[in-house]
Amino acid sequence: MSKQNLEEIIQTGIADTELSTEISTAIKRPRKYKVLLLNDDYTPMDFVVEVLKHFFHLNEEVAIQVMLQVHFQGKGVCGVFTRDIAETKVALVNEYARMNQHPLLSSMEPE
C-alpha cells in the first residue's frame, strides 16, 4: 500500500466520520402513571367517593363509577399523571385515609 493510498483512506475515513456525526434533538415525553385505588372490605363507599372528588376533582357521577369499579373489580383508575404528580397523589390519599382511620390504599403503575 502506497503512502498516497493510506492518506486517501485516512482522509476518506475522517470525512465519512464527520458526515455521519449528527446531534439528536428528539425530546421524549415523560412517562405517565395510573393512580389506582385498591378495594378493601372496610372503607365506606361514600368515603371513596369523597376521596375521588377531593383529590382527583371528579364529579359525583364519575366518582361513583370509579368507586363501583374499585368495589367490583378490586381496583380502579383515578387518573393518569406524570410520575411526580402521581407519587404526590398516592401519598396524599394514603395519608388522608389513615387520618380518617380507613384502610383505603392508593398505588400507581406505569401506563
Curated annotation (Swiss-Prot):
Top-rank taxon: Bacteria
Organism: Legionella pneumophila subsp. pneumophila (strain Philadelphia 1 / ATCC 33152 / DSM 7513)
Stated family: Belongs to the ClpS family.
Stated name of the protein: ATP-dependent Clp protease adapter protein ClpS
One of the protein's GO biological processes: proteolysis
Function text: Involved in the modulation of the specificity of the ClpAP-mediated ATP-dependent protein degradation.
Oligomer status and interactors: Binds to the N-terminal domain of the chaperone ClpA.
PANTHER family assigned: ATP-DEPENDENT CLP PROTEASE ADAPTER PROTEIN CLPS (PTHR33473:SF19), ATP-DEPENDENT CLP PROTEASE ADAPTER PROTEIN CLPS1, CHLOROPLASTIC (PTHR33473)
